[in-house]
C-alpha cells in the first residue's frame, strides 16, 4: 500500500488480520469488514473446488480462519449477514468453477462447516456441549443472524445454571416439550394461538395470564439484547407451569380443550426457544 493515504494503507495491511487463531484483530470496522468478506470468500472458493478440510487435514487453514471470522463478528460486526456474503461469493465464481461437481451443494457444505466450527470454538472456550447446542440451535433457525451474540448468551446461560432452581426449570420445560412431541406424533395441528374462552381451570387461566405478561416482557428484553433478564423470566413462568401440570389434565378427552392446552404450552416454549433451547440441556 505504498504511496496510499494512511487509512487506506492501514486497511490493506489489517485486512489480513488475524494472522493466527489468537492473533490481533483489525483495529477499524473498515478493516474488519474487508477481512471478514475476504476470509468467507476464501472458504467459499476452496469448498467450490473441493479443497474443504477432511478429518484432521486442513492444509489451507480454513478451520483457523473461521476462528478469526467468529472473533471479528463478535467484536466488530454482530449483525453481519454471513449467508448473504456466502451467496454473493458463490454467485460471482467463474463459470468454469460453477461447472465443477464440487460446486454443487457447496453452500450447504459451507454452512454446515461454519456451524460445526462455531460449536467447536465455544466448546474449546470451556462451555459445555449441551450449553453450546442450546444456544446454537435457535441461532441456526435464523440463518446466521445473531451469531455475534452467541458468546454473551452462553455466558449468561452458564451463570443461570448455577442457580439452585435451574435444574427444576429444565425438568419442567422438558416435560412441556415432551407433550408437544407426543402431540406431533399424533399428527395434532398445534398452533401457538390460545382460545381464552376454552380455558376453564384456574391453573390454566393463571398460566395463560402469566404467559401473556412474560411474552411481552421477553420481546422487549430480547429486542434490547438483555439476555440475563430474559433468562430470569424462566423463574417467573416456572411456578405457574408447575401448578398447571399438577392440576390440569392436558391430554383430556375433549379435543378442542386438549389442543388449546397444548397450544398454550407450545406458545410458552416458543418464547424461550427463540434464544435458548432448554430441551437439549442435560
Predicted region positions:
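Amphipathic alpha-helical "coupling" segments that flank catalytic cores
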Residues: 1-282
Amino acid at each position: 500500500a505504498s504511496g496510499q493515504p494512511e487509512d487506506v494503507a492501514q486497511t490493506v495491511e489489517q485486512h489480513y488480520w488475524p494472522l493466527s487463531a489468537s492473533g490481533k484483530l483489525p483495529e477499524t470496522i473498515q478493516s474488519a469488514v474487508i477481512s471478514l468478506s475476504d476470509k468467507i470468500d476464501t472458504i467459499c472458493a476452496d469448498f467450490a473446488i473441493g479443497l474443504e478440510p477432511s478429518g484432521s487435514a486442513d492444509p489451507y487453514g480454513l478451520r483457523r480462519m473461521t476462528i478469526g471470522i467468529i472473533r471479528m463478528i463478535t467484536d466488530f460486526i454482530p449483525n453481519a449477514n454471513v449467508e448473504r456474503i456466502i451467496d454473493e461469493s458463490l454467485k460471482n465464481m467463474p463459470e468454469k468453477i460453477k461447472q465443477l461437481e464440487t460446486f454443487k451443494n457447496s453452500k450447504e457444505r459451507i454452512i454446515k462447516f461454519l456451524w460445526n466450527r462455531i460449536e467447536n470454538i465455544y466448546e474449546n472456550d470451556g462451555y459445555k456441549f449441551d450449553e453450546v447446542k442450546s444456544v446454537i440451535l435457535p441461532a441456526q433457525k435464523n440463518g446466521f443472524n445473531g451469531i455475534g451474540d452467541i458468546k454473551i448468551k452462553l455466558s449468561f446461560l452458564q451463570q443461570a445454571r448455577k442457580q439452585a432452581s435451574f435444574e427444576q426449570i429444565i425438568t419442567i420445560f422438558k416435560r412441556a416439550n415432551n407433550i408437544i412431541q407426543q402431540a406431533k406424533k399424533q399428527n395434532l395441528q398445534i398452533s401457538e394461538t390460545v382460545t381464552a374462552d376454552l380455558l376453564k381451570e384456574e391453573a390454566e387461566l393463571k398460566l395463560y395470564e402469566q404467559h401473556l405478561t412474560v411474552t411481552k416482557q421477553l420481546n422487549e428484553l430480547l429486542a434490547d439484547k438483555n439476555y440475563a433478564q430474559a433468562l430470569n423470566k424462566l423463574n417467573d413462568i416456572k411456578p405457574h407451569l408447575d401448578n398447571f401440570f399438577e392440576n390440569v389434565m392436558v391430554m383430556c378427552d375433549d379435543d378442542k380443550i386438549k389442543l388449546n392446552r397444548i397450544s398454550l404450552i407450545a406458545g410458552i416454549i416458543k418464547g424461550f426457544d427463540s434464544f435458548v433451547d432448554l430441551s437439549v440441556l442435560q
